[in-house]
Amino acid sequence: MQILKGMTWDHSRGFDPMVASAKKFNEKYPDIRIIWEKRSLQAFADRPIELMAFDYDLMVIDHPHVGEASRKDLIYELNKSEKFEDQLKSLNNSSVGLSHQSYNFNNNQYALAIDAAAPVSSFREDLIKNIPQTFEDVIKLAEQSQVMWPIKPVDSISSFNSIAANLGYPINEKHEVFLDVSVGKSILKMMKDLAELVPKECLHMNPIETLDYMSTHNDISYCPLLYGYSNYSREGFRNSLVH
């Protein structure tokens, strides 16, 4: 039997589907077994993809890794074989937003989108009456100690880009300038104002930790920006639902 090793991250969203699909694959191809290993989200992000590529046959990656993978020739280009052409077109056409295209670099497809992560707001429906509609509303709620917001560096830049897009200045790789300085300063001012009102722990939190807290405590009702996990809006996943 041929054994293939895979690496993903330690969360039901990243691990459970891989194990389930590996089981289905083994039923169809009994001579091949896929064994998935997992590590924490932070350890997963910190370990260079170059090292993982040498240790594993399959990897769950984030799209920012694609450039390095292409430059160092670390990952097989899925479009190399014509037999996958129809499947790749189908996946692209059914993709949520640019999920599929985000793994395409220099006209090569290096990975498939197994799910879609997008910056969203999250809230406890049982704790909040009026969901904020503007940034000013978020500030007012934060002044009541009701807001949590993951702002580790990698999440801060995601929030920065999201706010820029909502203000009408989406980051575009075709632009020669990343963002106008005056716009950037305005966004940083907004982020600073909110950061001063949320718990200090937010400086070291990621979206999973934020959602875990919101679903198991009753003192936070809202988060303005984080990568969403639909698991938390399903009955029985945690103590309380987070939408």
Residue ranges and their predicted role:
Residues 82-91, 145-146, 168-188, 234-237:
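Short, solvent-exposed loop/beta-turn-alpha elements that line the ligand-binding surface or hinge
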